Amino acid sequence: MRSRALFAGIGVLLAVFAADVLAAAEVRGVRLWRAPDNTRLVFDLSGPVQHSVFTLAAPNRIVIDISGAQLATKLEQLSLSNTPITSVRSAQRSPTELRVVIDVSAAVVPKSFSLAPNQQYGNRLVVDLFDQEAAANEASTPQVAVAPSTPQPPVSPTQPATNKLPPVPGGNRDIIIAIDAGHGGEDPGALGPKGQHEKDVTLAIAKELQRQINQEKGFRAELVRTGDYFIPLRKRTEIARKKGADLFVSIHADAAPSRSAFGASVFALSDRGATSETARWLADNENRSDLIGGVGSVSLDDKDRMLAGVLLDLSMTASLSSSLNVGQKVLTNISRVTPLHKRRVEQAGFMVLKSPDIPSILVETGFISNHNESQKLASAGHQQALARSIQGGIKQFFQQNPPPGTYIASQRDQGKIAAGPREHLVTSGESLALIAQRYQVSLAALRSANGLKNDNIKVGQTLDIPATALAAQP
């Protein structure tokens, strides 16, 4: 009887043991990316897990304990070049307790979080290893308010954004263009019919655009993303601001539900919602990048929060008007090298466009989901043509609206660059007096240039801005 009871007990234990093993999630893959200030590891899982992370010194190590998991891949296959990681090893402490040890050549600051499945990936565990200097800088940098409780004073469209680089002697600084290659790293963006990744196409076009802009005296282009790594959406505009950008240009090559969709588009921020169903779909899709790439507990599924973002107030009207202006010039130039999806600048709530002090545009270079366009977008020749057209529109805008203290402004003031006609697209909340003040022209001159009998203007109206210096207003 005792033997029978003993065997029965062992059988129960084995059954429980087997059930635990079957219930354990599998680590099916590990991916790694290096960014300028951190290294990201992504563990692809077959199901949700619990985890903890801690550090050890002498030697420096990061220990990741994953409960309810088994390793079903080889860690030795990871490419560790250009990272602080010297090796990655693991031990199955029990059938459902996995420990991963990351040996590092220098101390790092780990941050980790889990991500639920989405349309592209299953459950994931993300571990970011921040270089100590970058982590210290992040901790010491005050957080930027998302939505100020009181309106800020309007920002001139030709006035340099805050935190600019100090002007060079003589006030001849470069006009700085921040170029943001969409997606990257964990977030591949849209996929083409032959497996092309949007993140690769956008980076290639961004690098070509940087090369062409840097050939123009008085201009300097800075890449927001220089390689294949993920950057959260809000971080992209922060990087542009730190670089002292006068203009933020985000490059994309998106997909649409219909594979027949084709043509390039240019977007600016909308203060009243998307201007078309396609614009709304694209904005929703792009703004989910933070969910795909992972931004800790931040979720963009909440549409109210996503569309609220940085609320459009008085401080954004000048930036929005400049965005629409430069966007139209870029769109006109692009129409000479590729078909357009829409012949006017569209507006939608793209997160990367919500910067109150930097004019910003998003260029959809085409639909990578379209078979013909995906082939063109992968072509170096077409990428060069697209970059040339974007660069041309940017140059036209800044020759007409150079920020004070720049080389281009000094050349225009000396008569070496024709100022040319300036235009302003009226946006919600603007008055004729505010526009006159912004461009430093008199109300009388502004009325005369546009044949106005009074100060009444309409949203969407285009005003010609005269080159008259500010005179005493009547």
Residue positions per predicted region:
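Bacterial N-terminal signal peptides
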Residues: 8-20
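Signal-peptide-cleaved, periplasmic/extracellular N-terminal interaction regions immediately downstream
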Residues: 20-177, 431-437, 442, 474
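Soluble periplasmic/extracytoplasmic beta-strand elements of cell-envelope proteins
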Residues: 33, 40-44, 52-54, 61-67, ...
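Intrinsically disordered, low-complexity glycine/proline-rich and charged
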Residues: 103-141, 372, 381-402, 458-459, ...
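Stable alpha-helical elements in mature extracytoplasmic
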Residues: 126, 198-201, 205, 209, ...
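Catalytic-core regions of hydrolytic enzymes
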Residues: 144-301, 316-328, 415-417, 434, ...
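Active-site-adjacent mobile loop/cap segments within catalytic or ligand-binding domains
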Residues: 247, 308-409, 447
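Primarily a LysM-type cell-wall glycan-binding module
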Residues: 414-443, 461-462
